[in-house]
Curated annotation (Swiss-Prot):
InterPro entries: Calycin (IPR012674), Fatty_acid-bd (IPR000463), ILBP (IPR031259). This is Fatty acid-binding protein, liver. The modification N-acetylmethionine is found at residue 1. The modification Deamidated asparagine is found at residue 105. GO terms for cellular component: apical cortex; cytoplasm; cytosol; nucleus; peroxisomal matrix; protein-containing complex. Deamidation and transpeptidation at the beta carboxyl of Asn-105 forms an isoaspartyl residue found in an isoform of the DE-III fraction. This rearrangement gives rise to an extra negative charge carried by the acid form. The modification Phosphoserine is found at residues 11, 39, 56, 100. It comes from Rattus norvegicus (Rat). Coiled coil: none annotated. There is a cross-link at residues 105-106 (Isoaspartyl glycine isopeptide (Asn-Gly)). The modification N6-succinyllysine is found at residues 31, 36, 46, 57, 78, 84, 90, 121. Keywords: Acetylation, Cytoplasm, Isopeptide bond, Lipid-binding, Phosphoprotein, Transport. Belongs to the calycin superfamily. Fatty-acid binding protein (FABP) family. The gene is Fabp1. GO terms for biological process: cellular detoxification; cellular response to hydrogen peroxide; cellular response to hypoxia; fatty acid transport; intestinal absorption; long-chain fatty acid transport; positive regulation of fatty acid beta-oxidation; response to vitamin B3.
Length: 127
């Protein structure tokens, strides 16, 4: 399955508590909670380029599925991680105690991130 395309956030749950737990400052949490971010994915074989735009903040990540890479987090921190496929429609990674599962289903992406007992869920639609 190829996931290439542009997707815009439609809804999110537990944004504020999750971002607080990640250490994001309160002013940035308040600015970011209502922004409908856009993710652009270029998926070619095992290579993935991901550009996420939240207002003026842009995060670029490139990785090869199944290989260690450096990812930039929402806080701007760079972390080492391995992004793996589960089945043919889920990308899964773990970094700094956070498990991230990104599920592709037609024109919808559901990203679920878990940190301790806080679960942040973001649903995006293809635009």
């Amino acid at each position: 399955m190829n996931f290439s395309g542009k997707y815009q956030v439609q809804s999110q749950e537990n944004f504020e508590p999750f971002m607080k737990a990640m250490g994001l400052p309160e002013d940035l949490i308040q600015k970011g909670k209502d922004i409908k971010g856009v993710s652009e994915i270029v998926h070619e074989g095992k290579k993935v380029k991901l550009t996420i735009t939240y207002g003026s903040k842009v995060i670029h990540n490139e990785f090869t599925l199944g290989e260690e890479c450096e990812l930039e987090t929402m806080t701007g921190e760079k972390v080492k991680a391995v992004v793996k496929m589960e089945g043919d429609n889920k990308m899964v990674t773990t970094f700094k105690g956070i498990k991230s599962v990104t599920e592709f289903n037609g024109d919808t992406i559901t990203n679920t991130m878990t940190l301790g007992d806080i679960v942040y869920k973001r649903v995006s639609k293809r635009i």
